[in-house]
Amino acid sequence: MSVEPPPELEEKAASEPEAGAMPEKRAGAQAAGSTWLQGFGRPSVYHAAIVIFLEFFAWGLLTTPMLTVLHETFSQHTFLMNGLIQGVKGLLSFLSAPLIGALSDVWGRKPFLLGTVFFTCFPIPLMRISPWWYFAMISVSGVFSVTFSVIFAYVADVTQEHERSTAYGWVSATFAASLVSSPAIGAYLSASYGDSLVVLVATVVALLDICFILVAVPESLPEKMRPVSWGAQISWKQADPFASLKKVGKDSTVLLICITVFLSYLPEAGQYSSFFLYLRQVIGFGSVKIAAFIAMVGILSIVAQTAFLSILMRSLGNKNTVLLGLGFQMLQLAWYGFGSQAWMMWAAGTVAAMSSITFPAISALVSRNAESDQQGVAQGIITGIRGLCNGLGPALYGFIFYMFHVELTELGPKLNSNNVPLQGAVIPGPPFLFGACIVLMSFLVALFIPEYSKASGVQKHSNSSSGSLTNTPERGSDEDIEPLLQDSSIWELSSFEEPGNQCTEL
């Protein structure tokens, strides 16, 4: 992906206009560009929540049709192909997230919210037009599938430090809420009217989300934080997907947190990519039961990430809340691995809902251990780790299913049918048990994370620094804008020494 200077910048280089004409031209350009950036009201967490809700509601509608199309397209090695498709998408997201983040720090959040939602939802109508193109576009759409990253930057722009823990929890809960009813609605429409109508409704919802961003969402990044010219230089170090990972070893606390995130999110990413197929193939869930299961877990996750998270953070503390979430994750993965009956899946689903507190708690822990002007780098590291897991996790789970000969040989087996494979196996779900072992290692690593620490020795950005945003004005003291990813030459993570006040998640 290349970033070329806009035509007006090249014209400026060819013939420099008079000095007195520059402010007038610049003001006119800013006035023209500010019209579509205004939206309705002041930027808030509610705008971000609606964008997330609509995007994942559209994809939730396609849960049942997607399982059918996946089986029809890849009748052999279904789990493996699903893992590879999702793995390619995740790796592309990991590679593109820093560039999109750096550009959003320059040009604002709204243009990139619009772009990420559009390209993420672009494959939806292709499901009925051409399944092969649909899966190909899903893989390629990973380049822009970083809506959550831009949303988190948007939320950080509009909240104070002490509000971010709650705000991240609400955004994560909104994601869960979008999956409460959409799979059930999609399953009903599919059974009553066919998959074509489901795809049409999902496409309409995606278009509604795009229109909402275009018309209603205001820009969250203040104009004075953006460069005067849209042709401002961007350091390519900001676009390096491995730049944030290189900072991990510079501080022991950051290293421990990142290892914890990697070991906990790797099995979670794999689980998200294959679990609905697993419920249908191994356990024998039909479309209605899968939709009901998603709704139950979604509702409980909302309660866990809103009410329970706040209570646990106050009573147990940040670190112990993370440990509790990892404990729930371990239990639910082991239960999925050994469970062979439907009731076991329902019981494990309640535990899975409680494990959803882990990522918001980790986000709060990261923010708590970083100074206010280091938030972009600290959260950027976590974003990079999760992006890497989104690529590796699905491929890992697909490979393990393939190694243990778990295939989608029959679509929608009847519950308690003798044809359902692995019902009598000692370990019906090998990838989930493997994931539980990985989370156990994550739990052991998290034990060594200090409860309180604060970064110090921050190296501030100088206006004379080369390769950075030379036209970006200084930050006002009354504003706390958190960039998605910062240039490694701007911020350096130093050793965490002094305890400080608490501040702060698809």
UniProtKB/Swiss-Prot annotation:
Q: How does it sit in the membrane?
A: Multi-pass membrane protein
Polar residues compositional bias, start-end: 459-474
Spell out where the chain is glycosylated.
N463
**Record flagged with keyword Membrane:** yes
User: Short name of one Pfam family for this protein?
Assistant: MFS_1
* Molecular function terms, GO-annotated: transmembrane transporter activity
Where does the protein end up?
Membrane
Question: A Gene Ontology CC term for this entry?
Answer: membrane
Residues exposed to the Cytoplasmic side: 71-82, 133-134, 190-196, 277-281, 341, 409-428
Q: Which residues lie on this side of the membrane: Extracellular?
A: 1-49, 104-111, 156-168, 218-255, 303-319, 363-387, 450-506
**Stretches for region Disordered:** 1-25, 457-481
Which residue ranges traverse the bilayer? 50-70, 83-103, 112-132, 135-155, 169-189, 197-217, 256-276, 282-302, 320-340, 342-362, 388-408, 429-449
Per UniProt, which keywords does this protein have? Glycoprotein, Membrane, Transmembrane, Transmembrane helix, Transport
* Family note: Belongs to the major facilitator superfamily.
Q: Spell out the protein name for this chain.
A: Hippocampus abundant transcript-like protein 1
Gene encoding this chain? MFSD14B
